Amino acid sequence: MVVAKIEKTGTLSTEQLQKMHAYWRAANYLSVGQIYLMDNPLLREPLKLEHVKPRLLGHWGTTPGLNFIYVHLNRVIQDEDLDMIYIAGPGHGGPGLVANTYLEGTYSEYYPNISEDAEGMKRLFKQFSFPGGIPSHVAPETPGSIHEGGELGYAVSHAYGAVFDNPDLIVACVVGDGEAETGPLATSWHSNKFLNPVRDGAVLPILHLNGYKIANPTVLARISHEELEKLFEGYGYKPYFVEGSEYEPTHQLMAATLDTCIAEIKAIQHEARTGGATARPRWPMIVLRTPKGWTGPKEVDGKKTEDFWRSHQVPFSEMAGKPEHVQLLETWMRSYQPEELFDENGTFLGELKALAPKGHRRMGDNPHANGGILLKDLKMPDFRSYAVDVAKPGTTFAEATKVMGIFLRDVMKANLDQRNFRIVGPDETASNRWGPLFEITNRTWMDAIHPYDDHLSQDGRVMEILSEHTCQGWLEGYLLTGRHGFFSCYEAFIHLVDSMFNQHAKWLKTTRHIPWRRPIASLNYLLTSHVWRQDHNGFSHQDPGFIDHVVNKRAEVIRVYLPPDANTLLSVTDHCLRSRHYVNVVVAGKQPALQYLDMDAAIKHCTKGIGIWDWASNDQGVEPDVVMACCGDIPTLETLAAVDILRQNFPDLKIRVINVVNLMKLQPESEHPHGLSDKDFDSIFTPDKPVVFAFHGYPWLIHRLTYRRNNHNNIHVRGYKEEGTTTTPFDMVVMNDLDRFNLADDVIDRVPRLRYTAAHVKQMLHDKLIEHKQYIHEHGDDMPEIRDWCWPY
């Protein structure tokens, strides 16, 4: 058993102890003031109801613990000259982080109107959770934050992502005991198996056991000390326990424990960096057990409050109906003795402010928490040199994501010295055809490596763990601290991080409008092994709905690309890696597929995002009878095959073929910056001709994006309609009416002059579908005429 026990408890001198306790009191005072007050910030007159906000919003319970940790981290940063940032997993303790950045001076530097005096304090208090003010959590508006902590579960993965390739950085990561019950958090403890002390920084997890969630005890606070200790030893940590409710001994124990943990981190790093990493180290962590709502009211209306769930939010909430609560609030706030903490102007006393680090060592002003400041452009090879040779459209085959993998291999190679590019994925890098990366780097692995293992090493730059949540959290932490990356995933299973994507998109949207927040590298997804080529794994693996989810977010931060072949995928990939402050979703196939555009045509097509394919159309100089649009690699294939059928049977039918790479082009320009104007949309799609649209995903998404268009009523969309099983590739499109025969049938139904004259052709199309079913049931594969089809014109 690992024994982690602190014997020494006299780390702080009497003067240090008194000053640190005073600093903590000041942070607690400011935190309570933010929740309750909009006037009389220093209680220079008796507190009255009109000084109190009419709507009381915020969370007190976790806040004193967050403040306690912050003041102790300040001391160790000063003593050891540490480069450290703070992640508050319980981000609902927002008043505490705002209070601490105000006390250290950072907040007023970022927001000069919140000055370091009584008037500034009044504004600080009033703005919190107030219309026109700031949110209640550790939101992007909070200096020093890379993690809002609104949706719980991601603190630890964000912390590790931040320290990868940041050898001097330490992230103090506070994990709430409620958050510790979430699935993503439980898995993310394993991130220590991927941390290389030679090249990476360190995470100091601080599990804050205050015992309660909103209305229930927490699991980890109620299990025995021995079981809790063994749990974290099993995770590979060396847990130190700091437990108490009495101020002086808890301060002393926390100080001694932090000194020990920092010393152990430095020793681990020194040994690895001088002798090389050999075995995975056992990193220290702290388990801090203090009362929920510490220093707050013991009881409210005769009911237990401190050290109980009732302190979670606002202990005194009925101020207007219970005047005695106003008096009790005043008593509570005066218990912090603000007259001993702030001078006559309302400025924090200099001797106390001196406890905070200076300049960029302040956790609120650390550049790593505003990663765009540190962001360096990737060194990019010329993607055009990776082009697939396409002498004639629709006649040669290539694996699009394998070509992309070759390009990413050389992006990785070009940036090895900068150490600012990583790949993440849930054990799918090779499956998704990014195997060429392993010619340059390996998978990160800090545990035992056997001779027969495949591409594992301690200095690998491909991060694989079978947890989409952890992959997403690592990448977000990496990007938020000023680096670049790509996440490849099976299309159906990216849904596991739907809500994580939500939170990151909200962060990007908000920070776009905060002047001091610098743009960061985009979060790039490759979604492959997609719905139309999951015929082998079956229905559970077939879901293209992530893009529906993505387009719900603000247009200013999301982009969705569906390149139809390898050269368009190369162009899109280059664009995504150069872009800033977006979420880019790229959907592409990994199987051998027909190639349509040479590199010059691909660049032009991707730059426009949507376009008429002249080589596939025959309406030059005249109005088309029908528009056939496609978006996605398989819909493109089936559309072109349908065009072939129609041209063979109706040589005089004028067909316009449109391909969409940038899905957001379909929206009006008033809704998305990439959207087409109505004039341009009508020019391409016509204002009145029938449109048969073959789409990669759920068909109603196209209707959502185009419902304001003049010709919307004539747009008929085919896509995935939740039909699937383990079958052949072509049968997948047949089951969803997206196949070439059904698309040709749709055209016949919608072109008036064909409706009643093409009955024989319609019957032939139906016969082909019957023939298809008979063939696959007998042979277990698609008909040769389907498998081997190429563009014949």
Swiss-Prot record:
Its cofactor is thiamine diphosphate. Its EC number is 4.1.2.-. Gene3D superfamilies: 3.40.50.920, 3.40.50.970. GO terms for biological process: carbohydrate metabolic process. GO terms for molecular function: aldehyde-lyase activity. The keyword Lyase applies. Coiled coil: none annotated. Keywords: Lyase, Thiamine pyrophosphate. InterPro entries: Phosphoketolase, THDP-binding, Transketo_C/PFOR_II, Xul5P/Fru6P_PKetolase, Xul5P/Fru6P_PKetolase_C, Xul5P/Fru6P_PKetolase_CS, Xul5P/Fru6P_PKetolase_N, Xul5P/Fru6P_PKetolase_ThDP_BS. It holds the Pfam family XFP_N. SUPFAM superfamilies: Thiamin diphosphate-binding fold (THDP-binding). Belongs to the XFP family. This is Probable phosphoketolase.
